[in-house]
């Protein structure tokens, strides 16, 4: 029986790895930005996937305390929306989706949709929040081209 469990875990690990690789391809093709927040370190990263690897990474140390500074170019309601959703994710493992305006590296405001998922540790305490954000205009343009 133990042998079957080990084999099952190996298969599960390979499936998880395959889905992770698939998600990187999707993120790269859709020009999505990935978000990772490590609760214990209070450090966040925003990056995009290029050639199946994280690229153009921006590091935000002491993130929670400095969200207002890091997002200072964003509209106030966007900052509050982001903070509220992050706080919800930090309370318990959950998923959320929301829209806000994000200032990109070219200095322009982009309306984005963001999905966040909180990841618990073995004690079911949230240890990480991951997310993906994409420009709503890109999605609207794609939908318009299909209709």
Each model region followed by its residue ranges:
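PAS and PAS-like sensory/regulatory domains
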Residues: 32, 96-98, 105, 110-114, ...
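PAS-associated C-terminal cap
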Residues: 1-20, 134-147
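PAS-family sensory domain signal
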Residues: 15-71
